[in-house]
Amino acid sequence: MSELTPMMRQYLEIKADHPDAILFFRLGDFYEMFLDDAVKASRILDITLTSRNKGGDGADIPLCGVPFHSAAPYIAKLVEAGEKVAICEQVEDPKSVKGIVKREVVKVVTPGLVIDAESLSPKENNYLLSLFPGPDRWGVAYLDLSTGDFRVTETDSADAAWAEVACVNPREILMPLSFRDGGAGSERPDLAAGRMLSYVDEWVYDAEYAERMVRNHFGVASAEAAGCGSMDCGLRAVAAVLHYLQQTQKGDVRHISYLQAYRTQEFLVLDESSRRNLELNATIGDGKRRGSLLGLLDRTVTAMGGRKLKQWINYPLVSIEKINERLDAVEELVADAEFRQGVRAALDGVYDLERLNGRISLASASAKDLVALRASLVRLPSLIALLTPAASTLLARLRDGIDLLADVEELIGRGIVPDPPFVLREGGIIAQGYHSELDELRSISREGKGFIARLEAQEKARTGISSLKVRYNKVFGYYIEVTKSNLSAIPDDYIRRQTLANAERFITPELKEYEEKVLGAEDRIVELEYALFQDIRQRVAAQGERIARTADRLATLDVLAALADVAHDHRYVRPTVDEGDAIVVTGGRHPVVEALNRSERFVANDVQLDNGENQLVIITGPNMAGKSTFMRQVALIVLMAQTGSFVPADEASIGVVDRIFTRVGASDNLARGQSTFMVEMMETAAILRNATPRSLVVLDEIGRGTSTFDGVSIAWAVAEYLHDTERCAAKTLFATHYHELTELAVTRNRVKNCNVAVKEWNDQVIFLRKIVEGGASHSYGIQVARLAGLPQEVIERAKEILHNLEKGEYAEGGIPRIARGKRAGAPKPSPQLSLFDQGDDLLRRRIAGLNIAALTPLEALNILDELKRMV
């Protein structure tokens, strides 16, 4: 250490405090990185790695660097690669310091603490999430530093906590240090993957410390006053976030002024699987917004409105009063196109006030950010005027809650020029007339420059040297330049400063005096402008809570207007939402499928579900007929209604549901080492554990991932359980290829059979996509295979095998006669192992599966003939 230069010793001391971050060490106009940081950063950033001898032992030290004025994209790239970046600035003026300049880390940028606009998706939140597992509860707190959005809740299980993680989709997760090795992150590696996991010392979660952190940050007397007093685990999760901010953000975070505590029971609960299966935020296939419900409904014109819409979709309401408040507002906007378009036009020029407010509070806002804030505020009076006649409760409340922030608008308008430069420390920011001393200095600067022009003309006249020039450069300042051929004509008061090849440069006492005056004024102008800008920014930051409230109201208004615009264009209707137990939809349509296929008429369908005769609807029919689309559309219509949106239907009445479960599709979970069938069974188990009579359950092809008999058995048992178990007798749509399940309608009084209508013509099948009562008579699998393009030879052979199976023709050993031949010495095929201990042969299984009470005499004779041929 003693052999290192003072600068490198300083670097290593600071680096020791931030071992897990890449240290951006400010040296003049560059951020330098050294040693391992340099090696890692040069690889990620694809910049040159060099070396320099910084010590007395002759060892080279790896280094790389980036310009400080364009560091943002480099920082963003490192953070995107999962790195933390510690920004170390010079906190003293190098000109006024002898020796080493004092440096400090002013902030640490992590994936969950990004505030730079260019690094953030405008309509996506960037959350830092904190998990704290208690003995019987989990605390979940999450913060978007860029907007100040801070929320906390508690769950009663680890699964529910991780479901919140999936919904929030944070960039970074905080957990207690004790969980670093095989702890909470290892419980759900699929959800932890792709996110930075950061660990916090155990003492931070101490109850007294947590309480003190919350009280001090929010300036309240107790945690109860902050909104999370009844959430012990939630309080500790919040404290971890606040502690992490203290460690990483040295500036003020006053825009984080409100903590929203909520109970998951306040919203319609959607687990991770259901959110994915319904494609709420992104499609299953490519993960894009287009093709998702969010992609369809998002006609918001502001970034903050887009973020709020996503929150509404992922957290639908269960309060009938709040749902109908939203529906009233949407209805008013749908009914008056001029009103709706006027509101949307007024909002269209509003910038992202939430993120502007965040940058202002964190002292990272530019002058252009302040101008953008003012440009947004000047639109508010006309917007409020538009809202004056609003009759719905919610629109009126939003109108009355919008703060014009006239004082903020006036301050920025008076203090900042309309088109300021990007760079803050080069002047040109503060408006003329805002500050008298600045105006005087500018006058001196302008007059001084005019004096130089007059001096040049004066000296040309005095010396008779027409080529004489008065110029300036940063090395010599102002000077008079005379060519060597004219040196004999210079006056005696010229003082030589520099000799060139063809000319010489001089100064005069008068020129030197004005140089000091002019240059002193320009330096003072830049210094004073920056100080005045900081003062304006701080005064605006002091109004951060007012700005945040207005931003929230504008975002809500934007969402309502967007939902109204979609409803108008797509002929959606207002649903009736009440406390009843029925879901009745007439002429329902899948919102996304309909929108993406405008050239083809969507076949609308009706549905009735309730806790009476229509509790469990068994839907049979071939693949591609539309079963999955129908079931998803029912779930989406319910979700849209409880979001406060109009719905794609001719008429809809929705009894509020508490949860929506979907078990649709098949996929392995390789990260958790689970097969398709295991994923299916785990999701089904979660439904049976958590469903209530208020829930909506959508099940598609339960049991298809195993053998036929096992699959039928599981599907049948699941259906019976949902019907017979009072605790979880949810309204259920149950699609299946197992036609045996249609028998449930005979033995269970709340089961109803439906199928997807199909028309056969010339050995072809036409899917009518209409849901009709009754069970399907055929599966049409071979016809679907033909439509998919299988070779005709395969189709014909499939028909032959199907015929043998249906006629019960069996070969030796009870195996269906499907093989055309058997090679000599071939081993006898082994049947697929069952999940259950089955000792019965095929004959016994067939007999055991008969419902004798439901057979007609003719059906009984036919089955007896079939059994005789099997013996």
Curated annotation (Swiss-Prot):
Keyword Transcription regulation among UniProt keywords: no
PROSITE patterns: DNA_MISMATCH_REPAIR_2 (PS00486)
Domain of life according to the entry: Bacteria
Record key words, sorted: ATP-binding, DNA damage, DNA repair, DNA-binding, Nucleotide-binding
A Pfam family reported for this protein in Swiss-Prot or TrEMBL: MutS_III
A biological process term (GO) from this entry: mismatch repair
Entry's Gene Ontology cellular component terms: cytosol
GO molecular function terms attached to this record: ATP binding; ATP-dependent DNA damage sensor activity; damaged DNA binding; mismatched DNA binding
Residues binding ATP, per UniProt: G621, P622, N623, M624, A625, G626, K627, S628
Function: This protein is involved in the repair of mismatches in DNA. It is possible that it carries out the mismatch recognition step. This protein has a weak ATPase activity.
Family: Belongs to the DNA mismatch repair MutS family.
Protein name: DNA mismatch repair protein MutS
Species name: Geobacter sulfurreducens (strain ATCC 51573 / DSM 12127 / PCA)
